[in-house]
């Protein structure tokens, strides 16, 4: 059986793959195009059961660093002009763990994905005409 540590390791690999994919498209940036990330953010579908390791991984404190690394990696390479999350608030299910938070009244101390996004946000400029 897979454990939470292994799931988190797979998320870290996925972050590196996504940054690499964005770098592969960097030639578009040279032509004054900007990368807009639509429906971005973590997914990590699981079985939807109570003991689902994927859901546990999304709730794990290490997700803060994984998401911060993702956003910072994209920004560091000049690859993000806008990011549109699939959903900012949503309960995990067998279809994925899309939300940065699971409920609008979730205690931020227990929302590591939201913390990771907030940690990486200060340098983001406002998006004009959006």
Where are these regions (language model features)?
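Noncatalytic carbohydrate-binding groove/subsite architecture in carbohydrate-active enzymes
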Residues: 1-35
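Catalytic metal-binding/acid-base residues of hydrolase active sites
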Residues: 41
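Aromatic-rich peripheral "rim/lid" segments of glycoside hydrolase catalytic domains that contact
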Residues: 48-69, 73-74, 84-130
């Amino acid at each position: 059986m897979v454990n939470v540590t292994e799931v988190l390791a797979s998320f870290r690999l996925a972050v590196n793959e996504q940054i690499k994919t964005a770098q592969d498209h960097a030639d578009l940036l040279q032509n004054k195009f900007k990368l807009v990330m639509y429906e971005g953010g973590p997914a990590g579908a699981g079985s939807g059961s109570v003991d689902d390791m994927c859901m546990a991984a999304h709730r794990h404190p290490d997700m803060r660093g994984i998401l911060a690394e993702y956003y910072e990696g994209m920004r560091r390479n000049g690859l993000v002009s806008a990011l549109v999350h699939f959903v900012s608030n949503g309960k995990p299910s067998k279809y994925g763990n899309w939300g940065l938070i699971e409920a609008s009244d979730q205690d931020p101390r227990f929302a590591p994905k939201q913390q990771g996004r907030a940690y990486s946000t200060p340098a983001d400029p406002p998006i004009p005409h959006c």
